[in-house]
Amino acid sequence: MKKFISIGTAIATALLFVAPLPSIAGHWYVGGTLHNATAGEWHKSSYENKLATAANWTLMDPNIRKISNKSSSMETVRPYAIELVACVDQVSAGDSYDKKYVSNLAAACMVSMGW
C-alpha cells in the first residue's frame, strides 16, 4: 500500500509540471518579451508579442492600473495596449530608429497620449 501511495504521489507531482493548470497562460497579455528590445527587433516580432509587451507597459501607468484593478479585467487595458503598439510602430518606423530601445519610445508615446 505504501508503495502505491509513493507512486501516486510521484505521478501527481509530475503532472503538476506537465499538465496545463488553469492560469493566465494563453491570454493576450502574457508572454511579452520585448521590454528591452530595439526598434529593429520590435518590427521583426509578432503582433501578439508586441501587444503583450505593451500591456505590461500600460500597467506602469497608475491611472490605467487603477482602471484595470477596479474592473478586475485585463480587457480594460487592451485598448490602451493596442494604441501603444500602434504608436510605437509609427514612431519607430524607418531605419534611423532600428537601434533605439522601444521602451524609451513607448514611454514617449505614453506621455504624448496624455497617460
Segments predicted by a language model, with ranges:
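Bacterial N-terminal signal peptides that target proteins for export
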Residues: M1-I11
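Extended interaction regions within the primary functional domain
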Residues: M1-K2, P22-A25
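Alpha-helical interaction segments
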Residues: I7, V18-A19, G31-T33, S46-Y47, ...
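Residues in flexible loops and secondary-structure boundaries
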Residues: T9-L15, K50, D61
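C-terminal segment of classical bacterial N-terminal signal peptides
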Residues: L15-S23
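N-terminal secretory signal peptides
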Residues: I24-D61
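Compact alpha-helical subdomains of small soluble proteins
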Residues: W28-G32, N56-W115
